[in-house]
Amino acid sequence: MLEGIIRESISKSAVKALRNDGYLIANIYGKGQENTHCAFKKNDFIRAVKSKTNIIFPVKVGGKEINVVVQEYQKDPITSDLLHVDLMLVQPGVETKFLVPVKTAGSAKGLKNKGVLILSKKRVKVKCSPENLPASYELDVSDLDVGDAILVRDLPELPNVKVIEKESVAIVGVIKAK
């Protein structure tokens, strides 16, 4: 489990000192909860996020174990190092917006006809409670030929999960290679 420390000071100099010690600055917030300013070891955080099987993962901060989801992160534009991450507290029964990953399965027919598979949306925004949150959307692309696409409206409908995207937006498609 990922363990972090609570930041006593939120000043610029304290943030610089933590970053120089290899920490990633983070904020944990939730509906009706007080914000928690904390820091995680950068390499431990990256390892934990890459190895998680679900969008929701547990962290331990200040002796308390809480379930969170990565809401937003900031990267250095030059070095691509993580600078800051916002973690949202997952509260049972509270409907929240999540970004659910999209995964493709199969090999598209259009690839044999000189086509290229393009994944336009890697994540789809949904609104639901954490209990109903899907781990990912699995899309079968084996029937896609050149010029075909799977749109948001073609996603499987899940109970108590509302997709908050325009229905005409393409998620994955096969285009003709030049």
Swiss-Prot record:
Q: Which CDD domains did the record assign? A: Ribosomal_L25_TL5_CTC
Q: Which InterPro entries match?
A: Rbsml_bL25/Gln-tRNA_synth_N, Ribosomal_bL25/Gln-tRNA_synth, Ribosomal_bL25_b-dom, Ribosomal_bL25_C, Ribosomal_bL25_long, Ribosomal_L25_dom, Ribosomal_uL5_bac-type
Q: Where is the signal peptide?
A: none
Which Pfam families has this protein been placed in? Ribosomal_L25p, Ribosomal_TL5_C
> Example GO biological process term?
translation
Keyword RNA-binding on entry = yes
A molecular function annotated in GO for this UniProt entry is: structural constituent of ribosome
Q: Keywords, A to Z?
A: Ribonucleoprotein, Ribosomal protein, RNA-binding, rRNA-binding
GO CC terms, sorted: cytosolic large ribosomal subunit
Coiled-coil ranges (or none):
none
The record's note on quaternary structure and interaction partners says:
Part of the 50S ribosomal subunit; part of the 5S rRNA/L5/L18/L25 subcomplex. Contacts the 5S rRNA. Binds to the 5S rRNA independently of L5 and L18.
What is the role of this chain? This is one of the proteins that binds to the 5S RNA in the ribosome where it forms part of the central protuberance.
Similarity annotation: Belongs to the bacterial ribosomal protein bL25 family. CTC subfamily.
**What's the protein called, per UniProt?**
Large ribosomal subunit protein bL25
Q: Source species, please?
A: Wolinella succinogenes (strain ATCC 29543 / DSM 1740 / CCUG 13145 / JCM 31913 / LMG 7466 / NCTC 11488 / FDC 602W)
